[in-house]
C-alpha cells in the first residue's frame, strides 16, 4: 500500500510550505540557515504519511499522520511514505492514526529510544492491514470526516459561549463602585443593596436540629 519516499526538496519549495507533522499545519516561522539546508527536507505530498515517534498516553509507540492539507516539505528526521495503490484520503487519515489498529503493528516495527520510538521501515512495510474496497473506504472516510467537522463546530460554539459568559459576568454585576449592573433583565431598576456577608447566612451548628 505504501513505499518509503526519499524524494528531497530540490530547492523550489520554500519554508512557507514547511509542514509541522505533530499538528499537520503549515509553519513558516522555522529558521533555516541556508537554501542548501532546505534541500535536506523531504517533499511531503497530499496523501503521504509520516511517522512521528514521540510516545504518549494516547500513542504508546508513536503514530503516523497523513498529509491532508496539501503539498509541502518536512524535516529529514521524519520517515515519509507514499501510497502506491488507489485509496481514499479520509479513510487512511483515520485508519493510519488509529491507535487500536496500529498499536500491534508499531509494537513490532519500532524500537525504543530516549522518550520516543524509531520506526524500522522494512518491518513496517512487511506488516499487513485489513482494507475494505475503495467504495467502502470513501463512505467510512466521509462519515468520520463529517464527525470531525461537527466536533470542530461544537468546539467553536463552546468557545463562543465561554466568551459570552465571561462578558456577561462583567456586565451583570456592578463594577467600580456602581450600584447597578450595566445589563439587567426587564422589570428591574432599583439599586443593589450593600450587605454584610454575615447577614446572608445563619450559623450552622453541628450535632443537632
Which functions belong to the PLM regions below?
Residues 16-30, 72:
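Short, basic/aromatic beta-hairpin or loop at an interaction surface
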Residues 1-8, 184-208:
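Non-catalytic DNA-recognition/assembly elements of restriction-modification systems
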Residues 29, 33, 38-101, 120:
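A short beta-sheet element
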Residues 68, 115-119, 173-175:
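Short helix-capping and inter-helix turn/linker motifs at the boundaries of alpha-helical repeat units
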Residues 72-77, 111-138:
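A short glycine-rich beta-alpha junction/loop motif
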Residues 9, 77, 109-115, 192, ...:
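Non-catalytic beta-sheet/beta-sandwich ligand-binding modules that flank or precede catalytic cores
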Residues 92, 128-166, 177, 183-198:
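Amphipathic alpha-helical segments
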Amino acid at each position: 500500500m505504501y513505499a518509503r519516499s526519499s524524494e528531497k526538496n530540490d530547492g523550489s519549495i520554500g519554508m512557507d510550505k514547511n509542514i509541522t507533522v505533530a499538528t499537520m499545519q503549515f509553519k513558516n516561522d522555522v529558521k533555516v540557515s541556508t537554501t542548501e539546508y532546505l534541500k535536506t527536507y523531504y517533499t511531503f505530498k497530499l496523501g503521504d504519511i509520516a511517522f512521528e515517534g514521540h510516545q504518549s498516553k494516547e500513542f504508546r509507540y508513536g503514530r503516523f499522520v497523513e498529509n491532508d492539507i496539501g503539498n509541502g516539505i518536512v524535516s529529514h528526521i521524519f520517515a515519509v511514505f507514499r501510497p502506491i495503490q488507489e485509496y481514499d484520503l479520509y479513510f487512511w487519515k483515520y485508519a493510519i492514526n488509529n491507535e487500536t489498529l496500529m498499536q500491534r503493528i508499531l509494537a513490532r516495527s519500532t524500537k525504543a529510544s530516549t522518550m520516543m520510538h524509531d520506526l524500522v521501515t522494512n518491518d513496517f512495510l512487511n506488516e499487513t492491514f485489513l482494507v475494505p474496497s475503495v467504495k467502502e473506504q470513501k463512505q467510512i472516510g466521509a462519515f468520520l470526516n463529517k464527525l470531525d467537522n461537527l466536533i470542530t463546530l461544537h468546539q467553536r460554539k463552546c468557545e463562543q459561549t465561554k466568551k459570552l459568559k465571561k462578558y456577561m459576568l462583567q456586565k451583570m454585576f456592578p463594577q467600580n463602585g456602581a450600584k447597578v449592573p450595566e445589563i439587567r433583565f426587564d422589570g428591574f431598576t432599583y439599586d443593589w443593596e450593600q450587605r454584610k456577608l454575615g447577614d446572608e447566612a445563619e450559623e450552622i451548628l453541628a450535632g443537632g436540629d
